[in-house]
Every structure is written in structure tokens, then in C-alpha cells.
Amino acid sequence: MERHLMDSQIKGVSTGTTILAVTFNGGVIIGSDSRASIGGSYVSSKTINKLIQVHDRIFCCIAGSLADAQAVTKAAKFQISFHSIQMESPPLVKAAASVLKELCYNNKEELQAGFITAGWDRKKGPQVYTVALGGMLLSQPFTIGGSGSTYIYGYADAKYKPDMSKEECLQFAKNALALAMGRDNVSGGVAHLVVITEEGVEHVVIPGDKLPKFHDE
């Protein structure tokens, strides 16, 4: 499967980070750690929520410069809401991802942030899109990003399977985040997860000491 690694060489306050999104049978799970750092060594916050709701059933997660990511998602939320009002219907997930793509492309010389967009809509159901530095848009059944993703590509490729149940997908996401947070010095804190289905949105927060443990920890 084609994979993408977010650029982790950032300046200023950074989200570090480990982010992911995974489709399952009937929905999608988007998740991240919660650590922010400066220069990759000083931990400026342990409780950053990197999962941003841009519409009812559409979320994005951020990697890179925190200021850049917040500015882009604020602009995206406005444009997506305006589009929804004009169309008199909820926005499609791909349309929301395309808004982020355009913002990233139009500001590619200044931005140091990448995004994963995930959600559910009535046209295509659960979807995951990677919006990379420079504005590339890629649709995938699952994706991982951020500095912590370096340590979990093998796990993700080996353990992901199509049409997982919600419970299987949650365990996959928990394990992936736990493995990355255990190895990557700029990923840590708690694990934030959001489950998105036709029925709605469910938020899950897992403290670091409640994450799955592995043999070398």
C-alpha cells in the first residue's frame, strides 16, 4: 500500500506527533497522541487535542507547526460551513479534504503542517484522506503520519485488514498509538480517538498508563 510520512522538521511549537485514521465496516476512527514540543526536545504541552472537528461527521488531525495547523483548520471550518449552507446539505468528506488541500497548496511556501481528514457521508460512507505538505491529496483506507509513524509502518501494514469491526479497529488504533508513543520522544501524553459513523460521533480518551503494554516496556 502507498504510504505517506508527514514532514517532522518543523520550527516553533510543534505537535510532534503521531496521527492516524483507519476505516472499518461502517465507520472510521481518527486518532492522535497529545504532546506538543519546541525544537523536538522541550515538551511545551502534554494535553494538546490534535483532532479538530470541521463539520458534524468530518474531523482532521494535524502534524507539524501548531500555529500553521490551527490557522489552516480555522479557515477550512469557515469555508466548509459556508459551502454546506450554500448547498443546503452536509458537505462530503472529499469536499472538506479538498478545501484543506487548496489552503495548503496556495500557502505551500509558508506552511509547515500536514493533515489527515476523515469522516462519513451518505455518498461514500467512511473515508480517509491525507493532505500532505504542498497540497497533495491522497485517498487511502488507512493512513499514519507524524514523527511517530516511523516506528509503526510495519505494525500497521501487518495488522490492518479491510472491513474490521469497530472493536477490532479501536484495538488496532490503540496499539499503533501505544507503540509509537513508546518509541518516539516527541509523541506522548494521552491517546485521543474519535469514532465516526452514520449514527454520530464518539470521543475516546485513553490516559498514557492505560494504553496497551508491550513486552519491552
Curated annotation (Swiss-Prot):
InterPro entries: Ntn_hydrolases_N, Pept_T1A_subB, Proteasome_bsu_CS, Proteasome_sua/b, Proteasome_suB-type. It catalyses: Cleavage of peptide bonds with very broad specificity. SUPFAM superfamilies: N-terminal nucleophile aminohydrolases (Ntn hydrolases). Its EC number is 3.4.25.1. The active site is at residue 17. It is found in: Cytoplasm; Nucleus. The keyword Protease applies. GO terms for biological process: immune system process; proteolysis involved in protein catabolic process. It is an enzyme of class 3 (hydrolase). Pfam families: Proteasome. Gene3D superfamilies: Glutamine Phosphoribosylpyrophosphate, subunit 1, domain 1 (3.60.20.10). GO terms for cellular component: cytoplasm; nucleus; proteasome core complex, beta-subunit complex. Residues 1-16 form a propeptide. Keywords: Cytoplasm, Hydrolase, Immunity, Nucleus, Protease, Proteasome, Threonine protease, Zymogen. GO terms for molecular function: threonine-type endopeptidase activity. The 26S proteasome consists of a 20S proteasome core and two 19S regulatory subunits. The 20S proteasome core is composed of 28 subunits that are arranged in four stacked rings, resulting in a barrel-shaped structure. The two end rings are each formed by seven alpha subunits, and the two central rings are each formed by seven beta subunits. The catalytic chamber with the active sites is on the inside of the barrel. The proteasome is a multicatalytic proteinase complex which is characterized by its ability to cleave peptides with Arg, Phe, Tyr, Leu, and Glu adjacent to the leaving group at neutral or slightly basic pH. The proteasome has an ATP-dependent proteolytic activity. This subunit is involved in antigen processing to generate class I binding peptides. Belongs to the peptidase T1B family. This is Proteasome subunit beta type-6-A like protein. The gene is psmb6l-a.
